Amino acid sequence: MVKMNGKFMSNKKFEQLYMGLYVETKKLKPNKIVELGTGCGSCTVAMARTLQEIDNGGSIVTYEFERPTAGSGMGSDSNVSELYNRFTEIGLNEIVKLNVGDVFKTWVKNPTDFDLLYIDLDNTWDKVYDVIMGNEFITSKIKEGATVFIEGGHPSHPRMNQSTLNDFNNKKGKEIFTFECLHGDRISLSKLTIV
C-alpha cells in the first residue's frame, strides 16, 4: 500500500490503478517520468514512492490544469496549491515537479525528455493520439523504447477499451495503437504501443 499523509490511499475503486503504477514503475526503473493529468496526485505519489525506493535519481514532471477547489471561496485555493502542499508535506517535492496548464499548449508543444509517459486526461483515443502524435520528439521517443501507460483499457472502461480502439483505428483507416491491460477493472492501467 502506498502511504500518503500517514494514511493509506484506500479508495478501493482506484487501488488497483495505484498499485499497478507502483509495480510497473518498479519493474521499469525509469529516470524521467512525465505524467499528463495529475488529478488528486495519488498516481504521482505511487510512482514517486517507487522512485524513492529504487533510488536512481529519477524524477517526475507532472502537468495539471489549475481550478478552484470545493470550499475555496472565489478561487483563493486551487487544486494545484493543494497538490504542491501535499507533495511537500510527504517529502516528494525533490522528486516531483508540478506544472500548471493545458498539456497540449505546454508539454506537447515543448516536450521534455522521458522514458515513461503516463496519460490520464479523461482519456479518449483522440486525446491520446493528439499527445503521442502531436510532436515528432514524443513519437520518436516512444518508437525508440520509452514506455507509455494510459488510464483505461479494461473492457468496462467507458471510453478506453478494445471496442473504442477498434472504432478509432477504423476512423483513421489503419491500426495506430494496440494496448495491453495490465491492472485494474473499470479504472485500469494499460501499456500502449504505437503500431
Q: What do the PLM-derived regions correspond to, one by one?
A:
Residues 1-28:
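Class I SAM-dependent methyltransferase Rossmann-like catalytic core
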Residues 22-195:
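S-adenosylmethionine/decaboxylated-SAM
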